[in-house]
Amino acid sequence: MNKTAIALLALLASSASLAATPWQKITQPVPGSAQSIGSFSNGCIVGADTLPIQSEHYQVMRTDQRRYFGHPDLVMFIQRLSRQVSNLGMGTVLIGDMGMPAGGRFNGGHASHQTGLDVDIFLQLPKTRWTSAQLLRPQALDLVSRDGKHVVPALWKPEIFSLIKLAAQDKDVTRIFVNPAIKQQLCLDAGTDRDWLRKVRPWFQHRAHMHVRLRCPADSLECEDQPLPPPGDGCGAELQSWFEPPKPGTTKPEKKTPPPLPPSCQALLDEHVI
């Protein structure tokens, strides 16, 4: 057997293994009152809502992957934000990954999105609604220059600034992750109204979408919130540190073994996955 065939078989075996992630075997939300459990990168959800696929204000991408589940607060946030955007005539909001029916760990692509409180939203607002084919295979619009130091001026639109600001001003939002170059542009454009910038955090990648995270719902007693972002607009030395070259001898951290699940999430898996 030649090397190409061996590599292909290994890839297929790897894909099959990834597809067998226990959380992906739960195909419907777990009945019960809505409860986000654990942390954003190690948790689950009971009583998730399904984001309605049909809406005049937003469109859901990659519906074949069935990642449009979340806490009712997340569904209401998406509906609230997209309605604001529509009322301002800014375009259609494009919704990416939320979470799986019971939350939990993905087979790749996300470390978080596990408690039904995270959503990815494309940083483009089409004036014409996308076709079904476009939604199934969406084309991301990379807003960041090749060197990663600034946004591409021709692609940066006032509507995108407004979209991020509207999301950050929402009472339920605790963090929004964007590329450092996008955060930098927001800092430049913000003027004197800057309180909302505290919630916008620079992070790796995130060149074409923002990752919005909500605070733990008050009645989700097993939900673990993150500490609040540091005071201030986050436009100073911390942001600039993202553009500095890595220090000599810096190596990528080793991949950590996932921590044990919260007991309630483990019990959920034990009950619902054969």
UniProtKB/Swiss-Prot annotation:
Disulfide topology: C44-C265, C187-C235, C216-C223
| Broad class of the protein's primary localization | periplasm
Q: Which residues bind Zn(2+) 2?
A: D147, H150
Regarding protein family, the annotation reads: Belongs to the peptidase M74 family.
GO MF annotation, one: metalloendopeptidase activity
**Could you give one GO CC term from the UniProt record?**
outer membrane-bounded periplasmic space
GO process terms (BP): peptidoglycan metabolic process; proteolysis
Does the keyword Disulfide bond feature in the UniProt annotation? yes
Enzyme Commission identifier(s): 3.4.24.-
Cofactor list: Zn(2+)
| Function, in words | Murein endopeptidase that cleaves the D-alanyl-meso-2,6-diamino-pimelyl amide bond that connects peptidoglycan strands. Likely plays a role in the removal of murein from the sacculus.
**Which protein are we looking at?**
Penicillin-insensitive murein endopeptidase
Subunit (UniProt): Dimer.
- Give the residues annotated as coiled coil: none
Q: Which UniProt keywords apply?
A: Disulfide bond, Hydrolase, Metal-binding, Metalloprotease, Periplasm, Protease, Signal, Zinc
- Quote the cofactor binding remark: Binds 2 Zn(2+) ions per subunit. Zn(2+) ion 1 is bound in the active site. Zn(2+) ion 2 is bound at the dimer interface by residues from both subunits.
Give compartment(s).
Answer: Periplasm
The residues that the entry says bind Zn(2+) 1 are: H110, H113, D120, H211
Q: Which species is listed as the source?
A: Escherichia coli O1:K1 / APEC
The residues that cross the membrane are none
